[in-house]
Amino acid sequence: MRIINRLSFLLITFLLGYSSVYSQTQADVKMGEILNGGDLFQLRNEYPNLRDSVSIKMLNLIADTQLGIGFNKLENAAVALDSLLLHHQNEMDGQTSIGMAALQGMNFLNLGMYEQAGKVGESLVNALKNSVPFEALYSFVFMEKVGNALANVPKPYLERPDLDVAVPMSVETVGRGKHIYIPVEVNGITKNYIFDTGCSFGNFVSEKYAKEAGLKIVADSIPVSGMEIGFVKLATADSMKIGELVYHNPVFMVAPPDNEIDSVFTFDGVLGYNFIRDAREIIIDNEAGKYIFPHKVSDGEPNMYLSSNTPRVRINYDEKPFDLILDTGNVKSDLGNKFAEIFPHAIEGLAEHTTSRGGFGGISQITAVTLPKFCFKAAGTTVTLYDTEVVKKAESSNQLFSGSLGADFVLSFKRLAINYQNMFIRGE
């Protein structure tokens, strides 16, 4: 859903136009620079000191929106978005208004306010369907179709005992890396799901499993993006159980069979964003071979934020901050062309080779180099990963991809806490 991530870029155009009409204070200029820079950690640190000095109220509302979405304070983001779209439409150009509406629609989906999300998606589709290609429209179609199909479905919620809950984990070798699994029971059927922070909405399951588990199909032709844009069905269940945790009203994307992918590996399900977020904190204890869901959530300073429902972790490499996607469903960490551009010395002299990447929509061949040792600071400690591929060219020449921390990153720790309540990871 790349469209909901365009806000930072749209702001640049808006602020340049805005300054020609209104005089700006120093605080306004500084706030605009921070917002356009797109560094949420800088915004979080400097916003409290700037807020009262900013004369353009809309800038504060945009900051509240970005911080609310990025640091998982969805209700705060909802209030700011409502105010922006109700009272500041005339101060925004068309692209910025679209970006704000898209953020609001996705925020509605994440809050379980499906009917409202469907209406926002429908409005965006109707406004744009005759002027933009489907590749620019599909995320709004997703919003419309999912919101409308779930309009009468209660929002999901987690029921749990007042104690720590432990659930066994398992690890299996897949291709060039590993998958980390967690047992999930739906309608009396227990299967191992891939534990995947990179799955950005609901859960992702195979069509075969959906039939076996008796999932209720509520819609089809839902567009999603993987290796390419494809279509899935949408399904629901009354609940799913993970140990002593009961997650009510879960949502599932049901993928059709794919002979190319199925020839490499098969899967039943992928546990995604909504449950992981609502669990608040999950400790992956690799030594004990289990997941721990603590009753009391840990405190900590953020080193992670959400972008399109996917966590991005701030690491430090070569004494510089760098953000990587935390994608526990990726069998092995990889680095992208953004890393190659910022740290060219790291890959200098490394031989290029062909490698493959797979996911929903198929398998593609790409050119990469292999970094023998990737040493960086993250999660409160020093981490070393081995034989990390660096993809020097993205599929789109305009696209900069930073990279992702995959299963090998998770398994490099004795224990790794993933905390969505306070937006941090911490390892030992």
Which role fits each region the language model picked out?
Residues 1-28:
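Bacterial Sec-dependent N-terminal signal peptides
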Residues 23-428:
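Pepsin/retropepsin-fold aspartyl endopeptidases
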